[in-house]
């Protein structure tokens, strides 16, 4: 939700090393922002890494306004790590015996990804209005969704060392968007299932299978 600079992350790693903590979980994506360069999807960082600064006061997610275009002059708060910067963080952490664990939040908490790439949004969802009211879950029926996730995983594989864990989030997944989405309902019929939760299970299984297929034993 809030971007931490390279210097701040390194200072955290130094503190972790001092107290013999050996895993740094980086929450790189969430509704209010996407923080890692993905070369195949440049709008993730050109748009969804930046937002209009909020007025001082209590944090309110529904007031967040992400950049509506590249170089949006009003969206000046935020930032992201280039792939080279992330490699630098990983090397810095490794030299202090700390493992960096990247988290890419899916299928829920995906407002930032959906904001940049509308093909991830379910049919019938009034985005972005409903996206800030719990309908921030990517579509389970569109083929673009699985392709997107696989592409992101492919790039993570080039950044992180072999055998590095990848966290896929999968928390607080709202199924409401899937209920009236023609693509999700079509996928549900293919699975011969009635429960919307089956879509989430199927998605996670497909992603996990893909990640495992990349492991060379």
Question: How should each PLM-predicted stretch be described?
Answer:
Residues 16, 100, 168, 211:
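Conserved, mostly hydrophobic/aromatic
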Residues 215-217:
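Conserved small/polar residues in nucleotide/adenosyl-binding loops
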Residues 1, 29-31, 105-109, 171-175:
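Active-site beta-loop-alpha junctions enriched in small/polar residues
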Residues 32-95, 110-147, 176-195, 201:
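Aromatic- and acidic-residue-enriched carbohydrate-binding clefts of CAZyme catalytic domains
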């Amino acid at each position: 939700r809030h971007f931490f600079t390279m210097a701040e992350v390194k200072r955290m790693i130094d503190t972790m090393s001092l107290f013999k903590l050996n895993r740094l979980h980086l929450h790189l994506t969430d509704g209010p922002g996407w923080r890692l360069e993905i070369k195949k999807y440049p709008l993730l960082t050109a748009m969804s890494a930046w937002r209009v600064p909020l007025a001082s006061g209590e944090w309110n997610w529904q007031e967040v306004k992400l950049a509506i275009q590249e170089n949006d002059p009003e969206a000046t708060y935020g930032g992201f790590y280039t792939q080279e910067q992330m490699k630098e963080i990983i090397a810095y952490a490794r030299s202090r015996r700390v493992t960096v664990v990247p988290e890419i939040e899916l299928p829920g908490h995906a407002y930032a990804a959906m904001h940049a790439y509308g093909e991830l949004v379910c049919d019938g969802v009034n985005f972005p209005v409903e996206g800030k009211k719990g309908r921030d879950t990517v579509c389970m029926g569109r083929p673009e969704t699985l392709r997107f996730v696989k592409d992101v995983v492919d790039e993570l594989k080039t950044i992180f060392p072999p055998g590095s864990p990848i966290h896929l989030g999968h928390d607080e997944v709202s199924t409401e968007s899937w209920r009236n989405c023609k693509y999700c309902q079509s996928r549900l019929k293919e699975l011969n299932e009635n429960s919307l939760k089956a879509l989430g299970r199927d998605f996670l299984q497909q992603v996990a299978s893909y990640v495992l297929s990349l492991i060379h034993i």
